[in-house]
């Protein structure tokens, strides 16, 4: 696309800000709160349209608010307080997101992913599973699922995991059986494998807190709005029954609903064995990496009372440097990690301002009035269903979470009977599971969709079927199990 045709992407966020700012201030809101909301909405529109990278959009929004803080961030009463210096206060607010523990947890998890990639451990694990389970097509589907499952806790970029590690391996498998893309032979085995690749990525993105960056963004938004939070262990235990069910059910379900013509064969295990032989035996760096990852997972699950999850990640990264699993250059050159670090911190800052200015509490009270008369369970389920289905309108999980999660949290806070930890975990699971709905919902989706093995009609049909199944199972486990372990 030529730059001359992109001007509207730059103007649209500014137009949204201007339109909202010029509208009458709703009853119950202060003028500065409404102006803040106008800029916040403009940032969300910018994240959706992306005239520049998302991190830049968020940083520009923060800069505008901080510079104009006497009119956007602080009330007249705050400004009138003796000794109140808005310049210092606005700077403190602008950088507050960078001190959030969630930011450092996800940054550490990115470094874990770098360790997996640098040592080759992630590729080795996937190849071993393919070798052991690849004799039957159904078991090959489970090998793809288990590969994603093992990598997910320490790979917070589902794009890096699905498109960067898993896809380059499984794209080599169909041609071994003469299953070619954009050909009638694609249904032989290739279509099943590619569908398993994207559906496994979506499932594992919901299972672990650190499996997808928007999961951590949600926790940051939750904490800024309510001071409540969910630990890594809380998320894992709350998702446990649904996780087990999906991991065991999905490969079989895909096998039934999108059956491959070829049911078994020996070519895939032979290829995997050849690749493993080329890699050689497990080296000392891989062993050290494996030991550190096991230790981190144990502390994340069981060590919450003794050490913060972010501190676990921070310490493990330090050990990875000392043990020369990764180098300092690997850290400073990791563009993906720094990109997520900046946009996630900036979005948490913006969400904190939305709460500090009083917008969240006002919106919550507004919703409380409209939702009165309905049971908390009915409201919670209705909100989850609406949140889930709105995934169709977003091509970015980050924009989706940034735009809708604050409103969902405000709605839950408006009804004290709704258990916030349970509701937020259901919202978090919906982010990952709902990514299966469309071929543009998350980073790996276009990769698998463009593989030539998943025709458009098949993708949309399967996305709707699997999406509905995921939603039903999420609601059931959310109502029956999550309150048991989270409340």
Curated annotation (Swiss-Prot):
InterPro entries, sorted: CitT-rel (IPR030676), SLC13A/DASS (IPR001898)
Cytoplasmic compartment spans: 31-32, 75-92, 158-188, 257-291, 334-339, 391-392, 439-464
Domain of life assignment: Bacteria
Main location: membrane
Keywords (A to Z) from UniProt: Antiport, Cell inner membrane, Cell membrane, Membrane, Transmembrane, Transmembrane helix, Transport
Transmembrane segments: 10-30, 33-53, 54-74, 93-113, 137-157, 189-209, 236-256, 292-312, 313-333, 340-360, 370-390, 393-413, 418-438, 465-485
Entry's Gene Ontology BP terms: tartrate transmembrane transport
UniProt key word Cell inner membrane: yes
Bilayer disposition of the protein: Multi-pass membrane protein
Upregulation: Induced by tartrate, via TtdR.
Job description of the protein: Catalyzes the uptake of tartrate in exchange for intracellular succinate. Essential for anaerobic L-tartrate fermentation.
NCBIfam families (UniProt xref): dass
PANTHER family reported in the protein's UniProt record: DICARBOXYLATE TRANSPORTER 2.1, CHLOROPLASTIC
Protein name as annotated: L-tartrate/succinate antiporter
Organism for this UniProt entry: Escherichia coli (strain K12)
Lineage: Bacteria, Pseudomonadati, Pseudomonadota, Gammaproteobacteria, Enterobacterales
């Amino acid at each position: 696309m030529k730059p001359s045709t992109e001007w509207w992407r730059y103007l649209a966020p500014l137009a949204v800000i201007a339109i909202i700012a010029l509208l009458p201030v709703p009853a119950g809101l202060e003028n500065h709160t409404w102006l803040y909301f106008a800029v916040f909405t403009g940032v969300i529109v910018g994240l959706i349209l992306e005239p520049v990278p998302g991190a830049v959009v968020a940083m520009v929004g923060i800069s505008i608010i901080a510079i104009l803080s006497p009119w956007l961030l602080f009330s007249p009463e705050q400004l009138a307080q003796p000794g109140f210096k808005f310049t210092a206060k606005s700077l403190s607010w602008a950088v507050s997101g960078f001190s959030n523990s969630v930011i450092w947890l996800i940054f550490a998890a990115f470094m874990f992913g770098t360790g997996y990639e640098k040592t080759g451990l992630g590729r080795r694990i996937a190849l071993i599973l393919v070798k052991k389970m690849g004799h039957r097509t159904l078991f090959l589907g489970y090998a793809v699922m288990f590969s994603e499952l093992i990598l997910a806790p320490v790979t917070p970029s589902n794009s890096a995991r699905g498109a960067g590690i898993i896809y380059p391996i499984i794209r080599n498998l169909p041609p071994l059986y003469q299953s070619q893309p954009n050909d009638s032979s694609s249904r032989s085995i290739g279509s099943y494998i590619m569908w398993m690749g994207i559906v496994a990525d979506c499932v594992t993105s919901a299972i672990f807190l650190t499996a997808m960056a928007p999961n951590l963004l949600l926790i940051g938004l939750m904490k800024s709005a309510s001071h409540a939070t969910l630990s890594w262990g809380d998320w894992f235990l709350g998702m446990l029954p649904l996780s087990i069910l999906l991991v065991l059910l999905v490969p079989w379900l895909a096998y039934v609903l999108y059956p491959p013509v070829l049911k078994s064969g020996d070519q895939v295990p032979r290829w995997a064995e050849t690749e493993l032989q080329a890699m050689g035996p497990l080296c000392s760096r891989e062993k050290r990496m494996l030991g550190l990852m096991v230790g981190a997972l144990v502390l994340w699950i069981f060590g919450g009372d003794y050490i913060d999850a972010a501190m676990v990640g921070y310490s493990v990264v330090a050990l990875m440097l000392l043990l020369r699993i990764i180098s300092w250059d690997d850290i400073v050159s990791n563009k993906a990690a720094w990109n997520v670090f900046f946009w996630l911190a900036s979005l948490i800052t913006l969400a904190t301002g939305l709460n500090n200015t009083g917008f969240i509490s006002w919106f919550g009270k507004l919703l409380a009035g409209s939702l009165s008369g309905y049971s908390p369970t009915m409201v919670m389920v209705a909100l989850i269903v609406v949140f889930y289905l709105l995934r169709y309108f977003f091509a970015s999980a980050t924009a989706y979470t940034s735009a809708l999660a604050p409103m969902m949290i405000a709605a839950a806070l408006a009804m004290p009977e709704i258990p916030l930890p349970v509701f937020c975990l259901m919202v978090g699971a919906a982010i990952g599971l709902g990514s299966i709905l469309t071929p543009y919902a998350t980073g790996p989706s276009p990769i698998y969709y463009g593989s030539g093995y998943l025709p458009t009609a098949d993708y949309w049909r399967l996305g709707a079927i699997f999406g509905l199944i995921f939603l039903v199972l999420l609601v059931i486990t959310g109502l029956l199990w999550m309150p048991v372990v989270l409340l």
